[in-house]
Amino acid sequence: MIPQWKIYPRSQGHSTVYLQNVVDDPSISVGDYTIYDDFVHDPRDFQRNNVLYHYPINHERLVIGKFCSIACGAKFLFNSANHTQRSLSTYIFPVLFEEWGLDVERVPEAWDNKGDIIVGNDVWIGYEAVVLAGVAIGDGAIIGSRAVVTKDVPPYTIVGGVPAKAIRKRFSDSEVARLLELKWWDWPEEKIAKSIDAIQSGDLEKLKRAANQA
């Protein structure tokens, strides 16, 4: 568990933050050791600059798992960014309810509610990528720079482009299944620290052996 007072993982640089210690919106949940790096803006302003169209009226959540790496300028766009396609017009009449004599309760009619954004564990989201409402990203996935993610991403899959499409899987199906079974990100911190060599080696057998050690 990271101490609540610890914001910067590197003593020599303040462009990277532990995200869970700079977010205070109860509808945003971030797992241990997930980092955000921003060399343009203050990374402590992630909640304001990177989580957009996120309003209490929609009761929507952003859930990010453990050990994720989020690059500079990555954005999470929520439901209010999507003008409804059910209407005969794209104009936001319900949002401008006072101008048009509508009830305030009709505001949500202006957009299509696609749900929460869920990001798994050990996910890397590249520079200026955009993740849209209703998307779930699986554990170990990689989102390419400036990709626009409109659909769910399976675990350990690399996606890129506009809209984002699968480029390739990082590992074989059997290896992915084993990694999802091991869930190293849920291990005690001491065990993870002892297993870093195994994780960094890319050797799944080595990680399996580490999993069996006390």
What are these regions (language model features)?
Residues T84-T90:
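Short, basic/polar amphipathic helix motif occurring as a linker/hinge flanking DNA-binding modules
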Residues M1-Q20:
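N-terminal capping/interface segment
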Residues S87, A141, D197-A198:
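Short secondary-structure boundary/hinge segments and terminal tails
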Residues W5, S69-A71, V176:
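Hydrophobic transmembrane alpha-helix bundles
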Residues V23, L88, L207:
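Short clusters of hydrophobic/aromatic residues that line enzyme substrate/ligand-binding pockets
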Residues P94, G101-V131, P163-A214:
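C-terminal segments of enzyme domains that contribute to small-molecule binding surfaces
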Residues T16-H83, P94, E99, R106-I167:
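Structural signal for interior beta-strand "rungs" in well-ordered beta-sheet cores
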